[in-house]
């Protein structure tokens, strides 16, 4: 039996805890969640302790089941990529 949100695409522009948790719950129910992050450093939640082998376990939990895409939206090519992704999504999450 399929999950309730299979076939739904979510673009996740959230950071830290509340937004990523909401997006993770959508992934838990079968949505395809694509997390958009800054290139080079990702989102600040990657620094939350506890750390294991240089990776934040908290970040891993908040972002379970997601795909990750590093995009520089200040770069015209990066912005164009995001503009092309937006119409393919049924849900867009942000918490800026």
List PLM regions with ranges.
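N-terminal helix-loop segment corresponding to the beta1-alpha1 unit
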Residues: 1-96
């Amino acid at each position: 039996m399929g999950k309730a949100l299979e076939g739904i695409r979510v673009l996740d522009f959230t950071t830290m805890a509340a937004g990523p948790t909401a997006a993770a719950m959508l992934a838990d129910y079968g949505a395809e969640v694509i997390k958009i992050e800054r290139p080079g450093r990702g989102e600040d939640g990657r620094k939350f302790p506890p750390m294991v082998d240089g990776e934040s376990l908290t970040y891993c939990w908040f972002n379970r089941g997601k795909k990750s895409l590093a995009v520089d939206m200040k770069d015209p090519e990066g912005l164009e990529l995001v503009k092309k992704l937006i119409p393919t999504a049924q849900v867009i999450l942000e918490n800026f």
